[in-house]
Curated annotation (Swiss-Prot):
The FDX-ACB domain, residue ranges: 708-801
Binding site for Mg(2+): D459, D465, E468, E469
All copies of domain B5, residue ranges: 406-481
Gene Ontology process terms (BP): phenylalanyl-tRNA aminoacylation
Catalytic activity: tRNA(Phe) + L-phenylalanine + ATP = L-phenylalanyl-tRNA(Phe) + AMP + diphosphate + H(+)
Keywords of this entry: Aminoacyl-tRNA synthetase, ATP-binding, Cytoplasm, Ligase, Magnesium, Metal-binding, Nucleotide-binding, Protein biosynthesis, RNA-binding, tRNA-binding
Subcellular location field: Cytoplasm
Cofactor: Mg(2+)
GO molecular function: ATP binding; catalytic activity, acting on a protein; magnesium ion binding; phenylalanine-tRNA ligase activity; transferase activity; tRNA binding
HAMAP family from the UniProt entry: Phe_tRNA_synth_beta1 (MF_00283)
EC number(s) on file: 6.1.1.20
Name of this chain's protein: Phenylalanine--tRNA ligase beta subunit
Keyword field contains Nucleotide-binding: yes
Length: 801
């Protein structure tokens, strides 16, 4: 929002520097982006009256004699196409500075002396987008009353100061000059004084000419007025100046009046050429799918049913709240004007303007909110201006459909509530002074008071909003600084937080790097690596298909990360994530999923790269399994690894499930080569472990056992076995032998080859025995070994070597 300081001072008596005002507004809730002066850097620019203008033969140049208030006429050579005798222009005399700090000097053009330069607004640094189209390709023509020799700054309001405000959505009331004036008046304790117009209506009724119908619940109110016998012409210079300083291009007096009212009241308006209507009934309705409309910018718009249009004779003539239609555009020959002032649903306008990429000053205000209280007043103000500036005759009455609430909103609170939240000791009198500055009526007492909030401040609805207003106007800098007095409770980590930290320590100690992947994925990937897939929880309105379902595993997202890195030549990767997966056992549309904390890692490439003295070492199953084992050693939990051939997307010969007390808590293994090919990644090993289940085990109390003073005894045993027998099978056979004093089983050798029959292998184990209360004898150990040997022979058909 660009605010003219000259214009602001017409609405409220404020006499401070713009720097001070900017600082004050920023500290009370409306951020000021900056302050600019259009005249900054410009100098020696005066009004010139062209006494004579002669064409230079065989050129586009003109030799002008210009009165600049000096004793003699000034000769200036000008190439502008619209220069002519009798007009007032902008003259940069020798020594003047124009845009880009360019200095004007005396010179000769085609042998003709030129004592200055006749300037366009572009040459003064004004943007092309705000310059009237009739002057966009030529020089600026000043009003007839301009006095030669006077500085041009006051004529064009270039000496104004423009304050740029950054308006947040909750303070859309400041998207108008009246709204800003109310804010400044409250800050400085001043009164606003707004211009009032005396509207004279004809006896002829507007309702006899047109009718209004609302056919959409997205249209809250629609009002129309008719002004006849208007003369379309350029606006007076003062109006053009105000619009240009606000960043709006002047068009003609009719369109400029609607834009002036937009800036003044924050009420978007539109003007139709009534003579171009094919009917007399104005209908505000939803568009039809496939309906088309050519807007004022000349673009044909394809409409959908969610768009709002203004239609006459079932033909759209405007895109409601966004832009008018070309078919009813105000032109130089327009005589009868229909003024529109309406309130449309902000969400609908935002969707339409966003879909069509068509943002406008009107759509911006409808999106953020409109002051219901001044819709009718703004309409009458615009009609009165057309009387003044276009000689129009206003037909009697507004034709209105829809009723808007205009009564103030009542919000109640207590003095104690205010002081508790601000840490102040304000009195009821202090509160009254604040709301008097804001222009809000207040009644009640220190026990409880009620504030009548005018409709212009639609952001205030609850007592917390009142507290904010009190703090803003009273002054944030006046609020006392105190330390919190509430008693503190010593905090501690939850069991899951402790577990996560211990897992993170092990993972990073193993050289893994933490990543965070998306919790949303495709429905297929959501269950791809799940050991027990549940119902899929899908979003009703996903942003993309790739992010439409809550994951039930982390591995699939981690493989996407692996693929992304491998595609960029980063092939040695070791990553992990501690995150949630979402299991849904109920109805996904009615029940929330269960969040399960998991630890997942992925390895690919080389553990060690080749150098002059060592060979490269690729990642394998045992390296991945070793990380898992290191984790459970750190957690002091005993787990069992069981070969798993049926896990989807995993290699059937290099995958194991992880059991804790007989319950499956995860898996570790190689991604199936076909799955790896789908992800376009090399050989990769992954593991996923359920931390939520582990947490419940971690909470069990530990029982202390005395450290025994008696030594342990070890025995080795070598077995000849079929290749199909796994390490787990052997350990299970040993553990089920019934030997109570067995404390450790360690595999220290595996061999297959020479002297071993085909289809067989040799495995050697070290078995440790210990009695915590006495020394073991050789006879006892021999009995234990006999039991173990018998169990191995019976259960896995082992041959003792």
């Amino acid at each position: 929002m660009l605010v003219s300081y000259k214009w602001l001072k017409e609405l409220v008596d404020v006499d401070v520097t713009t720097a001070e005002l900017a600082e004050k507004m920023s500290t009370t809730g409306i951020e000021v982006e900056g302050v600019e002066t259009p005249a900054e850097g410009l100098s020696k620019l005066v009004v010139g009256h062209i006494v004579s203008c002669e064409d230079v033969p065989d050129t586009h140049l003109h030799l002008c004699q210009v009165d600049t208030g000096d004793d003699e006429l000034r000769q200036v050579v000008c190439g502008a196409p619209n220069v002519k005798t009798g007009i007032n222009v902008i003259v940069a005399v020798p020594g003047a500075r124009i845009a880009d700090n360019y200095k004007i000097k005396k010179g000769k053009i085609r042998g003709m002396e030129s004592l200055g330069m006749i300037c366009s607004l572009q040459e003064l640094g004004l943007s092309e987008s705000i310059i009237p189209k009739e002057f966009s390709d030529g020089i600026q023509i000043l009003p007839e009353g301009a006095i030669p020799g006077d500085s041009i700054f006051s004529y064009l309001d270039l000496d104004d100061e423009i304050i740029e405000l950054s308006i947040t959505p909750n303070r859309a009331d400041a998207l108008s000059m009246r709204g800003v004036a109310h804010e400044v008046a409250a800050i400085y304790g001043k009164k606003v004084h707004f211009e009032e117009k005396n509207l004279i209506e004809e006896a002829e009724r507007a309702a006899d000419k047109i009718s209004v119908v609302i056919e959409s619940d997205k249209v809250l109110s629609y009002s129309a007025r008719i002004v006849k016998n208007v003369t379309v012409a350029p606006s007076p210079q003062w109006l053009q100046n105000k619009l240009m300083n606000a960043g709006i291009r002047p068009i003609n007096n009719v369109v400029d009046v609607t834009n002036y009212v937009l800036l003044t009241y924050g009420q978007p308006m539109h003007a139709f050429d009534f003579d171009k209507f094919d009917g007399t009934t104005i209908v505000a309705r939803n568009a039809e799918n496939g309906e088309k409309l050519i807007t004022l910018d000349g673009e044909e718009r394809d409409l959908i049913a969610d768009d709002l249009v203004i239609a006459v004779n079932d033909q759209p003539v405007a895109l409601a709240g966004v832009m008018g239609g070309q078919s009813t555009e105000i032109g130089s020959s327009s005589k009868t004007v229909v003024l529109e002032a309406a309130v449309f649903n902000g969400t609908s306008i935002r969707k339409t303007s966003g879909r069509l990429n068509l943002r406008s000053e009107s759509s911006s205000r409808f999106e953020k909110g409109i002051n219901y209280d001044t819709v009718s007043e703004a309409m009458d103000f615009a009609a009165a201006m057309l009387q003044e500036l276009a000689g129009g005759q206003v037909l009697s009455g507004q034709v209105t459909e829809g009723v808007l609430p205009t009564e103030p909103v009542e919000v109640s609170t207590t003095l104690g509530y205010v002081n508790t939240r601000l840490g102040t000791e304000l009195t009821y009198t202090d509160i009254e002074e604040v709301f008097e500055k804001l222009g809000f009526a207040i009644s009640g007492s220190e026990v409880k008071f009620t504030v009548l909030v005018p409709r212009r401040r639609w952001d205030i609805a609850i007592q917390a909003d009142l507290v904010e207003e009190i703090a803003r106007i009273y002054g944030y800098e006046k609020l006392p600084t105190t330390l919190p007095e509430a008693g503190a409770t010593a905090g501690e980590l939850t069991s899951m937080q402790r577990l996560r930290r211990r897992v993170r320590t092990v993972a990073e100690g193993a050289g893994l790097s933490e990543i965070i992947t998306y919790a949303l994925t495709t429905p297929e990937k959501a269950v791809q690596f799940s050991t027990q897939a549940t119902n899929i929880t899908e979003l009703m309105w996903p942003m993309t298909v790739d992010r439409s379902a809550l994951r039930q595993n982390v591995v699939s997202g981690m493989l996407d990360t692996i693929a992304y890195n491998v595609a960029r030549k980063n092939s040695n990767l070791a990553v992990y994530e501690i995150g949630k997966v979402f299991e849904q056992t109920g109805n996904p549309k009615e029940d929330l999923p269960t969040e399960v904390e998991t630890f997942t890692f992925a390895l690919t490439g080389l553990v060690e790269e080749k150098d002059f003295q060592t060979k490269s070492k690729p990642v394998d199953f045992f390296y991945a399994k070793g990380i898992v084992e290191a984790l459970f050693i750190k957690l002091k939990l005993d787990v069992t690894f069981v070969a798993q051939k049926g896990l989807a997307s995993m290699h059937p010969g290099r995958t194991a499930t992880i059991l804790l007390d007989g319950k499956e808590i995860g898996f570790v293994g190689q991604v199936h080569p076909q799955t790896a090919k789908q992800y376009d990644i090399p050989e990769t090993y992954v593991a996923e472990i359920n931390l939520s289940t582990i947490e419940s085990q971690m909470n069990q109390a530990l029982i202390f056992e005395d450290i025994t003073k008696y030594p342990s005894v070890s025995r080795d045993i070598a077995l000849l076995l079929a290749e199909s027998v796994s390490h787990h099978d052997i350990v299970s056979a040993i553990e089920t032998s019934g030997v109570k004093r067995l404390t450790a089983i360690k595999l220290f050798d595996v061999y297959a080859g020479n002297n071993i029959a085909e289809g067989y292998k040799s495995m050697a184990y070290s078995l440790t025995f210990q009695n915590p209360n006495d020394n073991l004898t050789d006879e006892e150990v021999a009995k234990y070994m006999e039991k173990i040997t018998k169990s191995l022979v019976e259960k896995v058909n082992a041959e003792i070597r």
